Design a protein with these regions (language model features):
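FAD-binding core of FAD-dependent oxidoreductases
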Residues: 53-75, 83-105, 135-157, 173, ...
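Feature of Fe-S/electron-transfer and energy-metabolism proteins
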Residues: 34, 64, 71-74, 78-81, ...
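C-terminal auxiliary extensions adjacent to catalytic cores
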Residues: 2-23, 27-34, 38-46, 155-510
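Catalytic or ion-translocation cores adjacent to nucleophile or general acid/base/metal-coordination motifs
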Residues: 69-85, 356-368
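Polyanion/phosphate-binding surface patch
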Residues: 50, 65, 252-253
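Cysteine-centered functional microenvironments
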Residues: 134-139, 317, 321
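Membrane-embedded alpha-helical core segments of multi-pass
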Residues: 126-130, 148, 219
Length: 510
């Protein structure tokens, strides 16, 4: 069944299905009628020569330049040509698909003033698998993602490039093969296609979905390391966290305890320290803080996905045109900067547990660097170096982009969100996070091989999956294939799926 885009019910999960799994979309009939009503009002205002920004005026510094009737017809074409000014490698196809879906949802409110043919064409592009080629770099996050979205708008004129059937080709060729008519651009159509923070929001939405699953795997790795380090289990009692009240910490402690169901540590059979180091016992608070950051950003992004990110905005029932700044990306870029920092923070915590697993002074009897042949062999010594190098890059990238505004357009656009930079750097932060977490998983599995007590059900399930991809390190071998295999394994979420099959969902309380 197609996902209905009605302007108010688009979730991150639905966006993932559209972007990654090619689920069909359908424009809600009531939304289509709203688009028609708004367009009719705009055309009446045009006939009356009422001044409307970006429709019969120039844009930015040229907003005071009024266009005559003939110029109005041509303006949208030149607007899109001018704004298709990105640079570099193309954005991923899933990101562009998500951006198009979010733009359809903006139009569904009936406040954008474009012709229905424009919105229908976006729907057809999604459903028939035609994806515009869009340079990822070039947006400053206000007025929205103008440069990348202009490359989407080029297809409305049969121009630009597109992916179709696994090939990159001229857009008109792709649309012809797919049987999609070229609608052309008339008054307002071009600006209504580009004037929102759609690509940065789309990328952020997909990242949040992945980060949530990464954090759940971080809890599994934490549980494995706690088992290997013979941890005192009192800090993970959910009652402790309920007394403080942070939802993320409550959730995280519950997930860790679920993974350790049936462990000799949980049943009190093992002698433990009275109190462990912060990198162990504060894991629920730290991972939980990241969960809370993700939850806030999730709310912000779903608000943006279901809001009217455009300028100007037309209100047909009041016959009103409002100009403002609903394209401004700050409501997304600010919380996503926080999320990027949260991923880095949790990666640092992971590396500190890795340190305790490999350091013989801290590992509660485990062999140095998790090898029996110390001296001849160095075990996982260099794995820590790799994790450290990834974290340094994460720290550099965690500098907020949302405070990096540079004035442009003759100071008419003198504060911008730089939200696209947030989205791009978060992609790299998360990619590094997959590597850091994969290395902790590998070390924890190696450490558990040296323990003889019974580990928890979830921990055992994770260990089994890891051993399908990376074998025990008996003697030194090149580790880069193992690191790459573990990074891919974390990205695939195979460990998460196996653990949840064994102990139930990790994102619900016990």
């Amino acid at each position: 069944m197609a996902i209905v885009l009605d302007g108010s019910s688009l979730t991150i999960e639905k966006l993932v299905r559209i972007a990654r799994h090619d689920e069909k979309v359908e424009l809600d009939p009531a939304a289509l009628e709203r688009i028609r009503v708004c367009r009719a009002m705009l055309e009446e205002k045009l006939k009356a020569h009422e001044i409307m920004y970006g429709t019969n005026t120039g844009i930015g510094e040229f907003s005071e330049v009024v266009l005559d009737d003939e110029q109005v017809k041509l303006f949208q074409r030149y607007l899109i040509y001018n704004h298709a000014a990105g640079i570099g490698d193309p954005a991923s196809q899933e990101s562009v698909r998500a951006a198009m879906a979010s733009r359809i949802n903006v139009h569904a409110h009936g406040n954008s003033g474009c012709r229905p043919e424009i919105t229908r064409t976006l729907v057809n592009l999604l459903n028939k698998g035609v994806t515009p080629v869009v340079a990822q770099k070039g947006s400053v996050g206000a007025c929205g993602d103008l440069a990348p979205m202009a490359q989407v708008a080029l297809l409305m004129m049969g121009e630009g490039e597109a992916w179709y059937g696994g090939e990159r080709m001229p857009a008109r060729q792709a649309m012809t093969r797919a049987g999609i008519p070229v609608p052309g651009l008339e008054a307002r159509d071009g600006l209504a296609t580009i004037n929102g923070a759609n690509l940065l929001t789309a990328m952020s939405a997909l990242q949040l979905f992945d980060i949530n699953r990464w954090l759940m795997q971080m809890e599994i790795a934490c549980a494995m390391s706690l088992e290997a380090l013979v941890a005192n289990m009192k800090p993970y009692d959910v009652r402790l966290h309920r007394l403080r009240g942070f939802p993320g910490a409550i959730r995280s402690a519950g997930a860790i305890m679920k993974c350790m169901q049936g462990s000799d540590l949980q049943t009190g059979k093992m002698k433990t320290k009275v109190q462990d180091a912060y990198s162990m016992r504060s894991s629920p608070q730290v991972i939980g803080a990241a969960h809370d950051a993700v939850a806030f950003a999730w709310q912000q992004i779903e608000t943006e996905l279901n809001g009217v990110g455009d300028n100007p905005i037309f209100i047909p029932e009041a016959r009103l045109t409002l100009t403002g700044a609903n394209f401004q990306g700050s409501p997304v870029s600010l919380p996503m900067d926080m999320v990027g920092a949260a991923v880095t923070m949790v990666s640092v915590l992971s590396e500190r547990r890795l340190n305790r697993l490999t350091n013989p002074a801290l590992s509660v009897g485990l062999p140095a660097f998790l090898t029996k042949g110390a001296g001849m062999f160095s075990g996982l010594m260099l794995s820590q170096y790799t994790a450290d190098s990834l974290i340094v890059e994460q720290r550099i990238l965690s500098t907020p982009a949302s405070i990096q505004s540079i004035p442009a357009a003759a100071d008419q656009e003198d504060f911008v969100s730089m939200g696209m930079n947030t989205a791009m750097k978060n992609a790299q932060i998360l990619d590094n996070g997959y590597g850091v977490l994969g290395i902790e998983f590998m070390a924890a599995a190696q450490a558990l091989d040296f323990r003889t007590f019974t580990a928890g059900k979830g921990v055992r399930a994770a260990h089994t999956v890891i051993r399908k991809h990376v074998r025990h390190l008996d003697e030194d071998r090149p580790l880069y294939p193992d690191h790459d295999a573990m990074k891919s394994l974390v990205r695939s979420c195979e460990i998460l799926e196996a653990v949840e099959k064994e102990v139930g969902p990790l994102d619900t309380p016990n």
